[in-house]
Amino acid sequence: MEKIVLLLAIVSLVKSDQICIGYHANNSTEQVDTIMEKNVTVTHAQDILEKTHNGKLCDLDGVKPLILRDCSVAGWLLGNPMCDEFINVPEWSYIVEKANPANDLCYPGNFNDYEELKHLLSRINHFEKIQIIPKSSWSDHEASLGVSSACPYQGSSSFFRNVVWLIKKNNAYPTIKRSYNNTNQEDLLVLWGIHHPNDEAEQTRLYQNPTTYISIGTSTLNQRLVPKIATRSKVNGQSGRMDFFWTILKPNDAINFESNGNFIAPEYAYKIVKKGDSAIMKSEVEYGNCNTKCQTPMGAINSSMPFHNIHPLTIGECPKYVKSNKLVLATGLRNSPQRERRRKRGLFGAIAGFIEGGWQGMVDGWYGYHHSNEQGSGYAADKESTQKAIDGVTNKVNSIIDKMNTQFEAVGREFNNLERRIENLNKKMEDGFLDVWTYNAELLVLMENERTLDFHDSNVKNLYDKVRLQLRDNAKELGNGCFEFYHKCDNECMESVRNGTYDYPQYSEEARLKREEISGVKLESIGTYQILSIYSTVASSLVLAIMVAGLSLWMCSNGSLQCRI
């Protein structure tokens, strides 16, 4: 009898039509972090932090960089004889200088405001070298004897190519008065210098005059230099020193020189023919004959990601630099595939609903339905809610970029030895800015991930509520994301539930009768259980009374119990 009842129950269950609401799941192992959780496995995720580069120096948008090899910027601009390959250079996208280039100031000394000049070069893409005071024009001074073994060329003493070291001629050094008027339409970079002899003897041997000066004047510059004669240690075999200076001469402005000795005169100047975004990078990386839109000192970045952690100094169309090691954006749902548990599967397929886990069988949408009826079973994605969700997450990366559209740029400023405290302060400020920038990026990703996952959960709940409000009491909520119909629901009926056109009145009478039938079965079962309970109680009491009476008679017969009547 029990087997028959169980079989009838199974048949009844099989015949029950069901519809379940669930979400997509897959075999993804991608994980993201949120505000509340770490390492949440999701169906889809997008890494938004670029961590790789090609390890090469590349052309930037088709324009080659100026790679100075073993020359410094000072060696290039002054014309160190070992830097002759850079006498005339084409347009550059950025400048590359080694950390400690061998060919710097061959004659020992100092380049004043060198760091400021480098900063100026970060906004220039092309120089045109022009002659402003020909070497042959110094008829009253020796213009070819100013050479040094510290600046050798092909085994002989030489000097910087772009300036002239003027020496006395015929034991005389007449006072120099020279001017140059910038008739060009472009700004002009002009360089000059002063020589500081080792002693008085060298001073008179080279310049005849024991007391000398150099005066330089423009509309914005008023400078007077005097040599500093002192005994010094030898550098590159020289006890003397040279200081070099520069200025930007505006169009229609003139530069005036006056000197009676120790003058390093300009022969060539640099016309600034093209300004634009550039940079001076300290790098030991080799040129790779490649092209890129973003260059760092470590190598080129070719990426569409919004962030990178390669190097703070970049040039070009680059991702934003952060110190993070991981920035992964959730674009899909929590990934919790339904477990293969026999008791949870149901008889018509892998239906677990959104509480127990996602469906790997639903591949054409993020949210949807699984139905089962006499015509069969199957999955169907909810196109409308899926498309809205896709539209929402598609704009997520752009949203993050918009929220962080003001990037702090570490421009790689340089400081001289007298500015070390400023340099240290600048580094601390840059590090502080980058720390804040990184924190903001990480926090934004965590918040967006939390919002995305909550958004998906909300969409599933909304879909569930949409079905629940349609079916009302025509179906029973099973508590796992599924509804069991109280009426027959064929494929057309299932489709009406999915598209929101379910006709509740059409099925309400059939559902009411089914509910009453189920209630009657329950009441009948309760009545049967009550009869069986009463019968069991009476029978048990009767048996107990007979046993007590029998025991009493036995005890009376053997004298163990006195019986009085």
Swiss-Prot record:
Cytoplasmic topological domain residue ranges: 552-565
Classification via Pfam families: Hemagglutinin (PF00509)
Cysteines paired by S-S bonds: 20-482, 58-290, 71-83, 106-151, 294-318, 489-493
Gene Ontology terms for molecular function: host cell surface receptor binding
Lipid tethering residues (S-palmitoyl cysteine): 556, 563
Signal peptide: 1-16
Compartment list: Virion membrane; Host apical cell membrane
GO cellular component entries: host cell plasma membrane; membrane; viral envelope; virion membrane
Extracellular side: 17-530
Transmembrane segments: 531-551
Function description: Binds to sialic acid-containing receptors on the cell surface, bringing about the attachment of the virus particle to the cell. This attachment induces virion internalization either through clathrin-dependent endocytosis or through clathrin- and caveolin-independent pathway. Plays a major role in the determination of host range restriction and virulence. Class I viral fusion protein. Responsible for penetration of the virus into the cell cytoplasm by mediating the fusion of the membrane of the endocytosed virus particle with the endosomal membrane.
HAMAP family: INFV_HEMA
Subunit comment: Homotrimer of disulfide-linked HA1-HA2.
Protein name (record): Hemagglutinin
